Amino acid sequence: MSQFSFTKMHGLGNSYIYVNMFEEQIPEEDLALVAEKVSNINTGIGADGMILICPSDVAPVKMRMFNNDGSEGKSCGNGLRCVAKYAYEHKLVEDTVFTIETLAGIVTAEVTVEEGKVTLAKIDMGAPRLTRAEIPMLGEGETPFIRENFLYNNHRYAFTAVSMGNPHAVIFVDDVEQAPLTTLGPVLETHEMFPERVNVEFIEILNEEEMNFRVWERGSGVTQACGTGACAAVVASILNGKMERGKEITVHLAGGDLMIAWIEEGNVLMKGPAEVICHGVYEYKIEA
């Protein structure tokens, strides 16, 4: 029987099991199965996945993120805010501004601290990737995919594809509560046009500075929030002429609000909370 200490944290209800790999050890070959086991709501701790906080050669810390089906993702906006909180409060970093390595590249985090506790984290998510090759999706590699039609159940849905280090398909609807989240979501996620699958967001524009947001996450299904998805939604809204670049946009997710801005210099900034739920020790056994 093996075990490791963990901290369960959430960003707007998007919860992960966080493991400090400066102190703990999980064999590389076991990571996918351990993520699946620990995320199980009935037989594990229950979460949207597992995130490892690891040493890095190029930044103070590195984030590795696993979905609850065991697949490894390249980035996670809510996860990055929680990693920033954990790293500062556990003295893995000293400054309130620092970098975090991800499989999608290096991002910059800035934490707001009150009485030694991080109350807010802002992440510079970098520039969005907009070509088919970067997302990735099938088709002519250097072309963008903006407001293209997809036929489902005799209804045409127009979506825009954006990568924030992971792929997103953003669909504008009149009412997110009536959106086909659990039906169209998995169909698009696994469609052959996306070789690495895709996260699917349904967006309802409220005004020039606010939107409602619901998400079907690749490898996890319906979640309360998706930070990279919120960034992609704002980028897609600007590309479609629905919002103005440079303004801070309030994104109302099922789990709460994020503040997102696609600044003129090119990068996308995300600001929001990160919360600790509990600490514990998880025991597991990998069958031979």
Curated annotation (Swiss-Prot):
It catalyses: (2S,6S)-2,6-diaminopimelate = meso-2,6-diaminopimelate. InterPro entries: DAP_epimerase_AS, DAP_epimerase_DapF. Substrate binds at residues 14, 67, 77-78, 166, 199, 217-218, 227-228. One of its GO terms (biological process) is lysine biosynthetic process via diaminopimelate. Keywords: Amino-acid biosynthesis, Cytoplasm, Isomerase, Lysine biosynthesis. Its EC number is 5.1.1.7. Its main location: cytoplasm. Pathway: Amino-acid biosynthesis; L-lysine biosynthesis via DAP pathway; DL-2,6-diaminopimelate from LL-2,6-diaminopimelate: step 1/1. Gene3D superfamilies: Diaminopimelate Epimerase, Chain A, domain 1. The record marks 168, 217 as: Could be important to modulate the pK values of the two catalytic cysteine residues. It is an enzyme of class 5 (isomerase). The active site is at 76 (proton donor), 226 (proton acceptor). GO terms for molecular function: diaminopimelate epimerase activity. One of its GO terms (cellular component) is cytosol. It comes from the Bacteria. PROSITE patterns: DAP_EPIMERASE. It is found in: Cytoplasm. It holds the Pfam family DAP_epimerase. Catalyzes the stereoinversion of LL-2,6-diaminopimelate (L,L-DAP) to meso-diaminopimelate (meso-DAP), a precursor of L-lysine and an essential component of the bacterial peptidoglycan. Belongs to the diaminopimelate epimerase family. Homodimer. NCBIfam families: DapF (TIGR00652). This is Diaminopimelate epimerase. It comes from Bacillus cereus (strain AH820). The gene is dapF.
